[in-house]
C-alpha cells in the first residue's frame, strides 16, 4: 500500500511538472529547427531594446515594492490592529482582479485626466512610468506576502532582547529583524521582478508603448503568426531562466556562507 501511494504521488507530481515544463521546453527546443529565425531575432536591436525596457521597468517596480512594501510587511507580521484583515485583503486584491481590469483601474488614476495623472509631472499613458505602475500593481502582493512571512519567522524574543539592551526600535529593525528576514525578502524581490517581466494585460491597457517583451510577442503573433512570435518568446524564456537561476545561486551561496559563519 505504501508503495502504491508513493507511485501515485510520483505520477500526479510528474503530470503537473510536465504540464508546466512541456510548453516552455517545446518553445525553446523548436527553435533548433528554426535556428535562422532565432538568430535573426537574437541579432535584432529592436528586440534587445524591448527586452532591456522590460527588465529595466521590472527592476524599478521591484525597488519601489521593496522600499514601500517592506515596512507594511513588517507591520502585518508584528502588529495587531483593528482592520488588519482588511489591509491584508487590500494587499491581495491585485491577485484576484483580472489584469485588463487592473489596467483600466490604473488608467482611471494615472491617465491624462486621472486622479493623479491630471496633475502629475510624469506622463504615464504610453510611457515608461505607466509600465512601471502596472508591473508594480500586479507584483507587489507577492513581495509583501513573502517579506511578511520572513518577518513572522523571526523569533520576537530576539527583538525584545535587543530592546532591553538599549537599542531603539529602528536599530532593532535594521540589525535584527531585517537581516534575519533577508532570505525571504530577496526571494520576494526575485519573484516580484519575475512577475513584473511577465505582465501583459495591465501594461497593454495603460502603456502599449514603449513596448515590453510580452507586448512585442503578442503583436508579432497577431501580425505575422506563431512562427514570428516564437523566436522572441524563446529569447525571453532563456534570458529570464538564466537570470533567475543566477539569482537563486547567489542567494544559495549567501545561505551557505551564513551557515558556515
From Swiss-Prot:
Record domain ABC transmembrane type-1: where: 51-247
Pfam family, one: BPD_transp_1
Extracellular side: 29-46, 111-123, 210-230
Membrane disposition: Multi-pass membrane protein
Cytoplasmic side: 1-2, 77-85, 155-184, 252-261
Entries under InterPro entries matching the protein: MetI-like, MetI-like_sf, Mo/W_ABC_Transporter_Permease
Presence of keyword Transmembrane: yes
Protein name per its UniProtKB record: Molybdate/tungstate transport system permease protein WtpB
Source species of the chain: Archaeoglobus fulgidus (strain ATCC 49558 / DSM 4304 / JCM 9628 / NBRC 100126 / VC-16)
Lineage, highest ranks first: Archaea, Methanobacteriati, Methanobacteriota, Archaeoglobi, Archaeoglobales
Underlying gene: wtpB
